[in-house]
């Protein structure tokens, strides 16, 4: 991506003439701002094209070099995540449900992560663990670990994940604790939690949505245009492999912010590699690179029905024969929406919250991953969510 960006800079150099496609908008902008027309020759003559190209080349090479240094430093870093593994409480159709402790009489909480990345982002660091924070507040949290598509039949779709894993997990919790669980969903996991909240309200005491998308057309059209143009290739890949491979899924999300990879590794290159910040960077980057493929039918639903056709907001997303309508959710609902999220834009998450009657919306000045693993996550997300759950459970 860094190399491609550099090449695009060179390719974007325009002829030094008033007739350049780029110079016309510049002229218009200057005239609108100053009220005076810009003489195209006067400004272009002040720039030596050779010097400009040389300066651009040096800057590009410096950025690439620093980027490469950062990548190498990350790959060679000896630090790795060393968190103790939680107990496996039970399984839902072979999917593990992880037990994070807490009192047996506490309010049970089932946390549902996204299908795209592994669940341990919710338990990444000792002092930045959403799951352990819930337990520390006297709740009894469980984590549904989706692992990877090999745990289901290759033809498994979202109906299978919800009807054969998510709902049975909620049934198990109610059977053991004699009370329904508070259901918490992060990212795509939050979107999925709306299904049992509609289909089996008897199993859901309350609902917490963390950066959960619903209106997939609330962002720019770039991703949708790319999906539309690439659909034939994507469908062929999914049909051939039976899944959307990790590299494909990661490429889609990198495309949401193409310069992020370069920026973060150049920043890492400047860090003290023995610092706490550097070690946290390594752990987080390891998690990001530890992705899982999407089962073929799930990939088609997410990419084409959700992102391309906006099936959720249009009332076209079904589990079985039932349309999932957030308007039918009657349980207490909290939506935590990070205002700096570039993966699930706030407008997308807000659309879901606004469809649920009486929902509470909490905005936090954090990013998509920062709300779970950032230095301010404990104060701004963990504690308020735990307090809200405790308050709901006591009523």
Model-derived features with residue positions:
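Gly/Ala-rich beta-loop-alpha elbow adjacent to hydrolase catalytic centers
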Residues: 184-189, 193
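Alpha/beta-hydrolase active-site loop
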Residues: 155-175
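Short beta-strand immediately N-terminal to the catalytic nucleophile in serine-hydrolase-like folds
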Residues: 183-185, 210, 336
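Short beta-strand/loop motif that positions the catalytic acidic residue
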Residues: 329, 335-337, 341
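Short alpha-helix in the alpha/beta-hydrolase fold that links the catalytic acid
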Residues: 331, 345-354
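Alpha/beta-hydrolase-fold enzymes
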Residues: 1-49, 175, 192-297
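Catalytic histidine-centered segment of alpha/beta-hydrolase-like enzymes
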Residues: 343-346, 366-380
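Short, surface-exposed "cap/lid" segments of acyl-processing enzymes
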Residues: 74-77, 82-150
């Amino acid at each position: 991506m860094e190399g491609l960006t550099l090449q695009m800079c060179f390719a974007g150099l325009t002829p030094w003439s008033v007739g350049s496609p780029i110079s016309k908008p510049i002229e218009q902008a200057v005239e609108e701002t100053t009220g005076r027309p810009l003489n195209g020759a006067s400004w272009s003559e002040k720039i030596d094209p050779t010097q400009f190209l040389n300066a651009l080349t040096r800057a590009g090479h410096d950025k690439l070099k620093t980027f490469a240094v950062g990548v190498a430093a990350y790959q060679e870093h000896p630090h790795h995540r060393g968190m103790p593994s939680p107990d496996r409480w039970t399984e839902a159709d072979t999917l593990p449900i992880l037990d994070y402790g807490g009192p047996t009489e506490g309010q049970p909480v089932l946390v549902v992560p996204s299908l795209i990345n592994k669940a341990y982002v919710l338990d990444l660091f000792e002092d930045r663990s959403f799951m352990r924070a819930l337990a520390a507040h006297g709740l009894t949290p469980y984590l549904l670990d989706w692992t990877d598509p090999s745990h289901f039949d290759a033809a498994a779709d979202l109906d299978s994940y919800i009807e054969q894993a998510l709902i049975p997990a909620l049934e198990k919790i109610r059977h053991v604790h004699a009370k329904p669980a508070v259901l918490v969903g992060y990212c795509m996991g939050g979107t999925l939690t709306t299904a049992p909240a509609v289909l089996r309200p008897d199993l859901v005491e309350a609902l917490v949505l963390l950066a959960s998308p619903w209106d997939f057309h609330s962002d720019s059209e770039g991703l949708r245009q790319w999906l539309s143009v690439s659909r034939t290739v994507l469908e062929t890949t999914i049909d051939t492999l039976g899944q959307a491979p990790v590299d494909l899924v990661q490429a889609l999300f990198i495309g949401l912010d193409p310069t992020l990879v370069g920026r973060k590794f150049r920043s890492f290159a400047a860090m003290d590699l023995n610092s706490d910040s550097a070690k946290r960077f390594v752990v987080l980057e390891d998690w990001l690179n530890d992705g899982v493929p999407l089962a073929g039918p799930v990939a088609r639903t997410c990419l084409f029905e959700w992102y391309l056709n906006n099936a959720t907001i249009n009332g076209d997303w079904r589990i079985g024969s039932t349309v999932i309508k957030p308007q039918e959710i009657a349980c207490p609902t909290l939506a935590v929406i990070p205002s700096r999220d570039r993966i699930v834009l706030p407008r997308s998450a807000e659309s879901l919250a606004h469809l649920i009657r009486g929902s509470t919306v909490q905005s936090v000045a954090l990013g998509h991953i920062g709300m779970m693993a950032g230095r301010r996550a404990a104060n701004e997300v963990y504690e308020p969510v735990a307090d809200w759950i405790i308050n709901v459970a006591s009523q």
